UniProtKB/Swiss-Prot annotation:
One of its GO terms (cellular component) is cytosol. Acts as a component of the histone chaperone complex chromatin assembly factor 1 (CAF-1), which assembles histone octamers onto DNA during replication and repair. CAF-1 performs the first step of the nucleosome assembly process, bringing newly synthesized histones H3 and H4 to replicating DNA; histones H2A/H2B can bind to this chromatin precursor subsequent to DNA replication to complete the histone octamer. Plays a role in the maintenance of heterochromatin. GO terms for biological process: DNA repair; DNA repair-dependent chromatin remodeling; DNA replication-dependent chromatin assembly; mitotic recombination-dependent replication fork processing; nucleosome assembly. WD repeats lie at residues 16-56, 65-105, 126-165, 168-207, 373-413, 417-458. Residues 239-257, 469-490 have a biased composition (Polar residues). It holds the Pfam family Beta-prop_CAF1B_HIR1. PANTHER family: CHROMATIN ASSEMBLY FACTOR 1 SUBUNIT B. Residues 239-261, 459-512 are annotated as: Disordered. This is Chromatin assembly factor 1 subunit B. The modification Phosphoserine is found at residues 468, 470, 473.
Length: 512
């Protein structure tokens, strides 16, 4: 493994100063071609050239139609369309062209150096609210977008038409992802929750479907003993803490600590990280305590980018906070939660701990590998039973950790590459290159030697067949604008999922 910062002029303003880079994505079916975007309202296309001793970047093109900062770039699964969106609230779909199309925002010098050209084919317009994240459907027919007006919007990628919108979050939607099995859509918000929508087909018209809110996950519930009830309901003295410790990293504490005057009582419902909510009186034998799963809006990050695994069996969500059960005075560490397909509507089955700063993004490698024979402990014996390994990267604000679905600890970690917070990560097609972007205006790259991550598995992952789409593919007659789940009863899609043999009471901590 080799990690290095690529020190070139990525994105810059009129004063020639570096501007933040907010997103990166590799083009599918290409030779390490990727796109970046940032605070200069530009999108740039690059070619990554790797060798045994160094990594070089070649400039290819600049896309200049946006008028404000661009927050996300995403290539479609085929790699022939690039979707971009940002603060102006408009999604633009770009396609390659043989002739340059100039605009007033184009730079003559960059245009002369360009080696390829792109043009806007489709424009998806919204109500003008800033868009933080995008994701394509597996068949490239649709796009979902999370926005600053607390909305999740779905567009037809062929026409740009807004098909449906959901307002089930109470704060900014900072991350979205589409299930590879085409059954679910997930959004994550700074309201400390994730929303899971099911794509349900109509019985009479299989080409027509709608999004139905199946679950909104924001807290985890524990059964407590009488002793535990006394410990967490004890009144606070002037010299006692609230039972919620500040993180060890006090130099960059992004969460507001609970005031010592906020005593925990039988009716307490403190909306803070690691907060407690009682569901029964203290003397009840059935008393339960629930804890918030995710960071609140004080987290200093524009993005919370979740990800499905390529086979659709796992979902990993960032921006988690874990409160160990029975330890009210324990510090609340940052974490990323893992959901299996069987638990996706309920609660996480495991969590990845040990991060000094919040997790902001997760990305799975497109390659799956043969199982290692030397692993002494694996997720397989705890939660999963997969005939292959999948590799995924977890990006914190200050570091990147690389895991696989077989081992319980990260096997690579990259730290101290940037002065400012990370914003996005992306894998290339062969899974040997991981790019990361930062607010400091630079990109860094982690390069793996062929075979370093393992032997590629010959096991085939079956995904739904692609289908043709039309502007009427989504039924928007049941749009939920009031914040509750749709009440229309539809016949759900039949998608095979793993059965849960027992109910999990709490996530299983996995410490690096």
């Amino acid at each position: 493994m080799r990690a290095e910062v690529l020190q070139i002029r990525w994105h810059y303003d009129a004063n020639d100063d570096h501007t933040p880079i907010y997103s990166v994505d590799f083009q599918k079916n290409s030779l390490n071609k990727f796109a970046t975007c940032g605070g200069d309202s530009k999108i740039r296309i690059w070619q990554l050239i790797t060798s045994e001793s160094s990594t070089k970047v070649e400039y290819l093109s600049t896309l200049s139609r946006h008028t404000q900062a661009v927050n996300v770039v995403r290539f479609n699964p085929e790699g022939n369309i690039l979707a971009t969106a940002g603060d102006e609230g408009t999604i633009m779909l770009w396609v390659p062209t043989n002739t340059p199309i100039t605009t007033l925002a184009d730079d003559a010098e960059e245009l002369a150096l360009a080696k390829e050209y792109w043009k806007v084919k489709i424009v998806c317009r919204s109500m003008g609210s800033e868009i933080y994240d995008l994701c394509w459907s597996v068949d490239s027919n649709f796009l979902i977008a999370g926005a600053m007006d607390n909305s999740l919007r779905l567009y037809d990628a062929h026409t740009g038409q807004l098909l449906t919108q959901k307002f089930d979050h109470s704060h900014y939607v900072q991350g979205v992802c589409w299930d590879p099995l085409n059954q679910y859509i997930v959004s994550e918000s700074s309201d400390r929750s994730i929303c899971l929508y099911e794509i349900q087909e109509e019985k009479k018209n299989p080409k027509k479907f709608q999004l139905v809110l199946k679950s909104r996950i924001c807290r985890i519930e524990y059964n407590v003993t009488k002793f535990e009830l006394i410990s967490v309901t004890k009144p606070l003295n002037n010299d006692e803490s609230s039972g919620i410790s500040e993180p060890i990293e006090t130099s960059n504490n992004n969460e507001s600590p609970v005031s010592k005057h906020e005593a925990l009582s039988s009716t307490a419902n403190i909306v803070k990280d690691g907060s407690l909510e009682r569901t029964e009186p203290p003397n009840s034998l059935n008393s339960k305590i629930s804890y918030s799963l995710y960071c609140n809006e004080t987290l200093v990050s524009f993005f919370r980018r979740p990800a499905f695994s390529p086979d659709g069996l796992l979902l990993v969500t960032p921006a988690g906070r874990l409160r160990p059960h029975g330890q009210p005075n324990f510090e609340v560490p940052y974490t990323a939660y893992i959901y299996t397909r069987g638990s996706i509507t309920k609660q996480p089955v495991a969590c990845l701990n040990g991060f000094k700063k919040p997790v902001i993004a997760v990305r799975f490698s497109p390659i799956h590998y043969e199982l290692n024979s030397f692993s002494n402990f694996s997720f397989t014996s705890v939660s999963f039973n997969l005939p292959y390994r999948m590799v995924f990267a977890v990006a914190c604000q200050d570091a990147v950790y690389i895991y696989d679905t077989q081992t319980c600890k990260p096997f690579y970690r990259a730290v101290n590459l940037h002065y400012s917070n990370l914003t996005d990560i992306a894998w290339n097609d062969d899974g040997n290159v991981l790019l990361m972007t930062s607010i400091d205006g630079f990109c860094s790259v982690i390069t793996f030697e062929p075979g370093e991550l393992g032997v590629k598995s010959q096991h085939k992952i079956s995904l739904p067949e692609k289908r043709s789409a039309s502007p009427s593919s989504i039924d928007d007659s049941q749009d939920n604008t009031a914040g509750g789940p749709a009440t229309t009863t539809l016949i759900p899609r039949k998608v095979e999922s793993s059965k849960v043999s027992k109910k999990r009471i709490a996530p299983t901590p996995v410490y690096p």
